[in-house]
Amino acid sequence: GKICLSDDINALMNEANVGAEKMYQAGLQCIRRNSATGKYYFIENSSDRKIEDWIPLRTEARSAAIFNPMTGASGLAAMKRNDGQTDVYLELNPGETVIVSTSGQHFTGDAYAYYQNAGEPNPVSGSWTVSFVQGGPQLPASITVDSLGSWTDFVGDEYKSFSGTAVYTTTINKAPVADVIKLDLGSVAENASVYLNGDYIGTVIDSPYQLYIPAEKFKGQDELVVRVANSMANRIAYM
């Protein structure tokens, strides 16, 4: 071993053969740990733009796998070797995170699902019924609205002071035109669980509030339910 002294942190890192990860130049941040067969990367998109690109990892690998801790999606990453490093293709919205596992061994399994937009966004049109199912200080009356929005914008103090859970329900009459449909809920305060025709699709608790739904779950006339729970801020303000 040896002790190195310098005022230049980059020089010290180079001397110790600890190289910087180039992904930081793309607006990504990571925590890197060694594993028995390779490395683990916890990667966050800390920029304000979506990342859809090949991202270099400072490691040599034969295989790489991606796991999304928020959605549970996982699979083998698209990757390529490049001059002693490994490039992995990532799609990350601002604030989104994934875990990438690299290995000198050959992984087998399903490929990680990457998505490309098949066309322009198609808004969910029609009315929504909003029912308040749990919370207080009292349960407001159900209401029908023309578009999704915060219940604090509804007319009436009972809506503005309500903290709890409300269920937004609508009917979709358009058949999907792609293999997978991305449902973008926009801004949610604070979390939302989505059901299609009674089937649980998933829960979102942070931005981006998006879920991917296989086209085969749609029947042509579909009931979409969004169960939203907010924080206690409204009720505290009421008190």
Task: Name each model feature, range by range.
Residues 160, 186, 237:
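Flexible, active-site-adjacent loop/turn segments at secondary-structure boundaries
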Residues 172, 176-192, 224-226:
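A short beta-strand element within beta-rich, extracytoplasmic domains
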Residues 232-239:
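Edge beta-strands of jelly-roll/beta-sandwich modules across compartments, strongly enriched
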Residues 1-165, 173-180, 199-204, 212-214, ...:
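Carbohydrate-binding surfaces of carbohydrate-active enzymes
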